[in-house]
C-alpha cells in the first residue's frame, strides 16, 4: 500500500464525515475559511530512530527541528504561523536536563517567529523519544496556496539550494560530523517570511514545502493539479553538484511553487530585491494524463531512478 496509499485510504474513509467547514486532506495544512481570513493547521511527528538518532543530535538541535518542520508547512500555505501545541513522550533518561535544553530552544525559536505555545501533552515512554507538534497559521483567505492550483504553462521554482540536509546525514553516518552540510541537516530553516510573501503574490499558484525530496514532493502537486512537469537537471540548485541528493534526499524545507509564466521574471526580480537572494527556476508544468515528471539535462531527456523518501 505504501505511505501515500495509506493516507489515501484514510481520506476515503473519512470523506463521509461532516468537515464543519474544514477542507479535506491534501495540502501541507488543512484550511478553515473564516470570512476573508483563514486558519490553517498542520501536525508532524519526530520519532527516535526514525527521524533522528539521539546520540547524533543535541536536545537544542531537536527542539529547533521539531518546530521548524511544522512552521515550514504553515509557510507553504502562504500565511504566517501564530501558535503551536507540543506533545512529548520521554523515557526516564530524557527527563530533566535533556528536556529543559529542548524546551529552551523551542521557546527561543517560538519567540523569534512570535509563535505562542498554547497547549500540548506529556507522557512517559518505554522506547525512545517521540515528539508531536501541531502548528496553527492565520492569514488572508486569498493568500492561501494549495497543491491543486498549478496550471499548464506555469514555471516551477524552488526557494533555495537543495541536497545539503541529505549530504549532512550521509556525513553523520560516516562519522564526519563537522561539515557545513551537517549543520544544515541539524538546524533546518523554515522559509517563514518567504512563504508569507509568496502568499501575497497572486501570480504564485501552487505551493508546498520540500520535505521528502523534489522528485517525490512535486508529484503531490502534479496529482492534485492533474498535470505533469518537465524538470531541467542543469537548472536545479544542487549543493556540491550532487543532483541525486538534491532531488531525492529530502528534509530541505525549501518552498516548491509554480508561477504564471508571464509574471515569472517580475517575481524573480521582486524576490531578489526583497530577500537579497534568488529563487531557482527548475522546470515547467505540462499536460500529462499520468501526472508524472519528465527529466531533461541540457535538452536531452533521460530516465533517472530518483525517488524521494517514504515511510512505508
Explain the meaning of each model-derived region:
Residues 1-312:
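Helix-biased detector of long, well-ordered alpha-helical tracts
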Amino acid at each position: 500500500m505504501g505511505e501515500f496509499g495509506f493516507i489515501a485510504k484514510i481520506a476515503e474513509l473519512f470523506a463521509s464525515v461532516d468537515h464543519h467547514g474544514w477542507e479535506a486532506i491534501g495540502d501541507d495544512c488543512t484550511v478553515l475559511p473564516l470570512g476573508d481570513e483563514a486558519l490553517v493547521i498542520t501536525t508532524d511527528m519526530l520519532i527516535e530512530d526514525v527521524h533522528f538518532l539521539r546520540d547524533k543530535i543535541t536536545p537544542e538541535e531537536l527542539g529547533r527541528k521539531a518546530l521548524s518542520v511544522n512552521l515550514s508547512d504553515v509557510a507553504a500555505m502562504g500565511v504566517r504561523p501564530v501558535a503551536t501545541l507540543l506533545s512529548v513522550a520521554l523515557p526516564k533518561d530524557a527527563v530533566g536536563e535533556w528536556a529543559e535544553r529542548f524546551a529552551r530552544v523551542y521557546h527561543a525559536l517560538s519567540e523569534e517567529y512570535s509563535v505562542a505555545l498554547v497547549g500540548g501533552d506529556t507522557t512517559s515512554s518505554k522506547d525512545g523519544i517521540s515528539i508531536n507538534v501541531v502548528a496553527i497559521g492565520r492569514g488572508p483567505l486569498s493568500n492561501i496556496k494549495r497543491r491543486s492550483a498549478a496550471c499548464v504553462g506555469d514555471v516551477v521554482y524552488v526557494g533555495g539550494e537543495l541536497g545539503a540536509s541529505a549530504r549532512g546525514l550521509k556525513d553523520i553516518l560516516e562519522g564526519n560530523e563537522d561539515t557545513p552540510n551537517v549543520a544544515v541537516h541539524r538546524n533546518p530553516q523554515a522559509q517563514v517570511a518567504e512563504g508569507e510573501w509568496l502568499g501575497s503574490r497572486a501570480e504564485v499558484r501552487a505551493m508546498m514545502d520540500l520535505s521528502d525530496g523534489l522528485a517525490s514532493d512535486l508529484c503531490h502537486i502534479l496529482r492534485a493539479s492533474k498535470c505533469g512537469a518537465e524538470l531541467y537537471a542543469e537548472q536545479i540548485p544542487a549543493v556540491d553538484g550532487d543532483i541525486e541528493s538534491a532531488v531525492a534526499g529530502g528534509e530541505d524545507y525549501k518552498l516548491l511553487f509554480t508561477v504564471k509564466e508571464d509574471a515569472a521574471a517580475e517575481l524573480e526580480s521582486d524576490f531578489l530585491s526583497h530577500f537579497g537572494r534568488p529563487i531557482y527556476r527548475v522546470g515547467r508544468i505540462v499536460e500529462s494524463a499520468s501526472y508524472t515528471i519528465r527529466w531533461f539535462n541540457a535538452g536531452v531527456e533521460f530516465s533517472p531512478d530518483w525517488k524521494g523518501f517514504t515511510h512505508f
